[in-house]
Amino acid sequence: MSKPIQMEKGVKYRDADKMALIPVKNMPTEQKEVLRKPDWMKIKLPADSQRIQDIKSAMRKNNLHSVCEEASCPNLAECFNHGTATFMILGAICTRRCPFCDVAHGRPLPPEAEEPTKLAKTIADMKLKYVVITSVDRDDLRDGGAKHFADCNREIRAQSPHIRIETLVPDFRGRMDVALEALKDNPPDVFNHNLETAPRLYRKVRPGANYQWSLDLLKKFKEQHPDVPTKSGLMMGLGETKEEIVEVLKDLRAHGVTMLTLGQYLAPSRHHLPVERYVPPAEFDELKEIALELGFTHAACGPFVRSSYHADMQAQGLEVK
């Protein structure tokens, strides 16, 4: 039996080291077991460009992180070329160890006090009109990092008065009321929190999270800020059924959520949860129709859709696939 990993503060643990700490064990996927990607999942990546390098340089210069890089998003090149990025605050080390996610796990360092100011300056320099701010889970902080989100919102608006801000927040486990109080005076323009999957799969996919808690977070924020749209996203291909997804959509609507993203899950490595099924584009189209019938004002559904993929277009109600 191998010895448990002794985590050092500030050290990133990935792949096998990260997965070794999960209560529900996921065996490494053998190459012969990996599902082959269908034709609709094969895309030609845009060539590296000066725009991509400029965004990466701005991130490095100010010690900022993007979830695009940390989570190995397949849309990175397209979004960076488009001049958009999803900034990840509160460091690049998560206190959770979800087996679908490529963000590193470990004991994070204290929040950087100057990060909101540096983030706001970088965004102003990039002349962005719409920005998405997300974070790792910070179960080590009393408010789960909510005040840091609020500070970032305030500083960004101070330097870019006409910008729209979308926050993709963690679940603030055990700290919901404290977190919502911290966000009260500086809320975003769109409040996003992902349910990720059907409740039956939570123990395997989101260990440490609770389906009803996440729904309640979305509902309570909406009750406090009725003019701010709430948004959530799900991954497809983890073993869920279509019927389960439809039930989740109904739950989201019952809790006031009006914006939705549905995308195909892609395994970051053989140590992560394997892809159980590649969902055809036609099925995404069908789920979009169902979502709109249920009352969602906008639903971005497609194999390559991610929570923040063309989030500016999503917020305008434009077609995103």
From Swiss-Prot:
Residues that bind [4Fe-4S] cluster 1: 68, 73, 79, 308
Name of protein: Lipoyl synthase
One Pfam family recorded for the sequence: Radical_SAM
Top-level taxonomic group: Bacteria
Comment on bound cofactor: Binds 2 [4Fe-4S] clusters per subunit. One cluster is coordinated with 3 cysteines and an exchangeable S-adenosyl-L-methionine.
Residues where [4Fe-4S] cluster 2 binds: 94, 98, 101
PANTHER family: LIPOYL SYNTHASE, LIPOYL SYNTHASE, MITOCHONDRIAL
Record organism: Vibrio vulnificus (strain YJ016)
Domain Radical SAM core residues, every copy: 80-297
Keywords assigned by UniProt, alphabetized: 4Fe-4S, Cytoplasm, Iron, Iron-sulfur, Metal-binding, S-adenosyl-L-methionine, Transferase
Enzyme Commission numbers on file: 2.8.1.8
Recorded catalytic activity of this chain's protein: [[Fe-S] cluster scaffold protein carrying a second [4Fe-4S](2+) cluster] + N(6)-octanoyl-L-lysyl-[protein] + 2 oxidized [2Fe-2S]-[ferredoxin] + 2 S-adenosyl-L-methionine + 4 H(+) = [[Fe-S] cluster scaffold protein] + N(6)-[(R)-dihydrolipoyl]-L-lysyl-[protein] + 4 Fe(3+) + 2 hydrogen sulfide + 2 5'-deoxyadenosine + 2 L-methionine + 2 reduced [2Fe-2S]-[ferredoxin]
Entry's Gene Ontology cellular component terms: cytoplasm
Record PROSITE patterns: RADICAL_SAM
NCBIfam families given in the database record: lipA (TIGR00510), PRK05481.1 (NF004019), PRK12928.1 (NF009544)
Gene designation: lipA
Subcellular location, record wording: Cytoplasm
Record family assignment: Belongs to the radical SAM superfamily. Lipoyl synthase family.
GO molecular function: 4 iron, 4 sulfur cluster binding; lipoate synthase activity; metal ion binding
Pathway: Protein modification; protein lipoylation via endogenous pathway; protein N(6)-(lipoyl)lysine from octanoyl-[acyl-carrier-protein]: step 2/2
Keyword Ubl conjugation: no
Entries under SUPFAM superfamilies matching the protein: Radical SAM enzymes (SSF102114)
Top enzyme class: transferase
Cofactor(s) required for function per UniProt: [4Fe-4S] cluster
